[in-house]
Regions:
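Switch II (G3) loop of P-loop NTPases
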Residues: 1-14
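Structural signature of beta-strand start/N-cap positions in the alpha/beta core
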Residues: 2, 24-25, 56, 84
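WD40-repeat beta-propellers
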Residues: 2-4, 37, 44-46
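Generic enzyme active-site microenvironment
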Residues: 3, 29, 60
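Short acidic active-site motifs
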Residues: 11-15, 37, 95
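Conserved Switch II/interswitch segment of TRAFAC-class P-loop GTPases
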Residues: 22-42, 52-55, 64-70, 91
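Conserved P-loop small GTPase signature centered on TRAFAC-class small GTPases
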Residues: 53-148
């Protein structure tokens, strides 16, 4: 399992596509006490879906320990997405383990059963988990002894 955390920093924006490559799940986190991060979620989600249209996504509202009223707000954009949504506190640990378990379960299921129109998943299955590994690599590996 590889976990990438860009902390929403703009300096990582150009690197985002490299993080999406080979992803089987995504946890998107916004700060429930700062509306700007909720607004940015729309940008992050759209960008991620451009690169990974099918992977499962869980959206998280963090920092509920700072203002418990945030759990009573309406988050229409997230409701419209129809993706799992939870509240967490990284400071006191509320729901943190649950979120990682849920994401891992979704990612494992996605990897085992990718959508039929997810051609990248099919290509990666042919290549194996690493380039040059897997059934296709065994058939095409050149040991140098054969002539072309």
């Amino acid at each position: 399992v590889d976990i990438w955390d860009t902390a929403g920093q703009e300096s990582f924006n150009k690197l985002h596509p490299s993080y999406y490559y080979g992803a089987h799940g995504c946890i998107m986190v916004f700060d429930a006490t700062r509306k700007i991060t909720y607004d940015n979620l729309k940008i992050w989600y759209t960008e991620m879906r451009t690169h990974c249209p099918h992977i499962p996504v869980i959206i998280i509202a963090n920092k509920i320990d700072l203002d418990p009223r945030t759990t009573k707000r309406s988050y229409k954009y997230i409701e419209d997405l129809k993706v799992p949504f939870n509240f967490v506190s990284a400071a006191d640990g509320t729901n943190v383990v649950k979120i990682f378990r849920d994401c891992l379960d979704l990612a494992i299921d996605y990897k085992a059963n990718p959508p039929k129109d997810d051609f990248m998943a099919e290509v990666m299955d042919l290549l194996g988990d690493d380039i040059g590994v897997g059934p296709a690599a065994k058939e095409t590996r050149d040991d140098g002894d054969d002539e072309f």
